[in-house]
Amino acid sequence: MRALAALSRFVGNTFAYWVLIFAVVAFLQPTWFIGLKGAIVPLLGLVMFGMGLTLKLEDFAEVARHPWRVALGVVAHFVIMPGVAWLLCQAFHLPPEIAVGVILVGCCPSGTSSNVMTWLARGDLALSVAIAAVTTLLAPLLTPALIWLLASAWLPVSFMELFWSILQVVLLPIVLGVVAQRLLGSRVRHAVEVLPLISVVSIVIIVTAVVAASQAKIAESGLLIMAVVMLHNSFGYLLGYFTGRLFKLPLAQRKSLALEVGMQNSGLGAALASAHFSPLAAVPSALFSVWHNISGALLSTYFRRMSEKQDRETAAQQAAE
């Protein structure tokens, strides 16, 4: 079991590399992965069940202690990312299926790896976990409402169908995970240790399935979609950080806000696009999944160095006094 837990930690720490490698392989050899499309929704449900296994009441203590900070993060997330997505679709005159895909990923809750990036960045982990949990729990209502509001100009959107899908693939597995944790107690500890491995394998399969199903369209429009995805993610980080600065939050909390706003649950975006629209609509989510793990790792390294520099300046100032 220790070896499996160690493997799980290694795979979790190298998540971005696995997603990138298998996305490239799926693009070069789509026939190897084309049959995996039917696994997208069940695998996302498995990831959400794992999230439920790890959720604790303490994760929501930050909501009680600093409700306005959590509310600020949640509002920033559901305003900035959908808004930027809509503006990018207008600016680039994106085709309907791609536009819906970009808006869809923009309307998803915070990403599953944002907490890890916040920890690496020396951000406020409690705030990060609280924002991720609250945005995920609000997703069954807010995500379909925002998609309907922003994407209906391009393609027909059914609020109720999206609502039921998110309820089944996000909220229900999380609730089942929380119940399992309560009933089994310490017996789920070993399962929790291997969750990073299960999550990484699941997301990798989701990304490869989407890339394989849309290989021809990616070859045709991939550079345009990638440019939009990179801009979307970057504006999320930037506007999230400066929202924290505008409200005079400390550096650690500005980092948390940047990462929670900029990183999306792109697995959910891919699942919803595959189930309700077309394989092409899932491509922005798949590319977002690859890119935000790379950019998140780079940004967290930069943020950590900011803190180290701040620590050195504080120490020098104290020594001078």
Regions found by a protein language model. Give the residues of each.
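Alpha-helical transmembrane segments of multi-pass small-molecule/ion transporters
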Residues: 1-321
